[in-house]
Amino acid sequence: MAKNSVEFDRYIERKAFDNTKEGVKGLIDAKITEIPRIFHVPQDTLPDKKRSVSDLEIPTIDFASVNVDTPSREAIVEKVKYAVENWGFFQVINHGVPLNVLEEIKDGVRRFHEEEDPEVKKSYYSLDFTKNKFAYSSNFDLYSSSPSLTWRDSISCYMAPDPPTPEELPETCRDAMIEYSKHVLSLGDLLFELLSEALGLKSEILKSMDCLKSLLMICHYYPPCPQPDLTLGISKHSDNSFLTVLLQDNIGGLQILHQDSWVDVSPLPGALVVNVGDFLQLITNDKFISVEHRVLANTRGPRISVASFFSSSIRENSTVYGPMKELVSEENPPKYRDTTLREYSEGYFKKGLDGTSHLSNFRI
């Protein structure tokens, strides 16, 4: 009986938080000094919740010479290959996205979340961003089996293949989102070429599989947390995408799990973070690795990040994906069963960010 009571209380508290439509920022605006218990992460995850003491750093790759000549491009492909096979993450500098575009999207995200009229934000509030061109929420997995909520608010929008009209986006971040998404799609085109070449295949092969077809932007706003040791910004997870391009500000807190240790992804001015998603690991048959990562809560803030997910759409999409035929053989048979983006993503979102791997459910 007591267990049911605890579970019922947790639902009631989450529902009450949901009903405010004010998110985590609403708690900060109310000047709380202790975070609600629904944000307390399980105690068994706390011992390793600390900043990295490792000297390890994820690879940084300079794209400046990617189209200069063949030797320069081949050298970059080798660096990309090493990064995605061994780390699953890398940072890119000289990626072609203008610095002013990077700054404006961060400013736009901040403007929306710090909108003075709360009714403007509330009008966009929805936990189901698959049915809305633009949605604002706090913890999409609010009612999932995830053991706790985490310290962030988010806005999300599908920018391709069916982008919103300008009128469907809030005025505070409209121009910034449209402009930034154009540059990210262009960078994604280049990244999938380099990844194809890193597989030893023709540069167009991943694009021909529609890896670049869908772009979902999720922009996170992490308010300062009065008790950062009790919660997380985002709990441990891997991405349900082919590829993710992340812009982060200078506050930090992103960590990746590498060789059983948490490694900080230190902010690099003007850089973008690129990471392999579950679907790219699946179709490359474990050639490229999708790595678990998380974001720590912080007394500093707000922290702002913009994550752009390629082909994480769960809208109607019947394409069946499995390990690429070019990468399997008798000696290296398929390690995953076939699935669709829709099937995979529906299970991923239903499960929530509970710290367990969804990809393992598809392993043969």
From Swiss-Prot:
Cofactor note: Binds 1 Fe(2+) ion per subunit.
EC numbers: 1.14.-.-
MF-aspect GO terms: dioxygenase activity; metal ion binding
Cofactor(s) needed by this chain: Fe(2+)
Record keywords: Iron, Metal-binding, Oxidoreductase
Domain annotation Fe2OG dioxygenase: ranges: 213-312
Residues annotated as binding Fe cation: 237, 239, 293
PANTHER family in alphabetical order: 1-AMINOCYCLOPROPANE-1-CARBOXYLATE OXIDASE HOMOLOG 11-RELATED, OXIDOREDUCTASE, 2OG-FE II OXYGENASE FAMILY PROTEIN
Pfam families tied to this protein: 2OG-FeII_Oxy, DIOX_N
Family: Belongs to the iron/ascorbate-dependent oxidoreductase family.
Entry-linked InterPro entries: DIOX_N, IPNS-like_FE2OG_OXY, IPNS-like_sf, Oxoglu/Fe-dep_dioxygenase_dom
Enzyme class: oxidoreductase
GO biological process: biosynthetic process
Binding residues annotated for 2-oxoglutarate, in chain numbering: 303
PROSITE patterns reported for this sequence: FE2OG_OXY
Stated name of the protein: 1-aminocyclopropane-1-carboxylate oxidase homolog 11
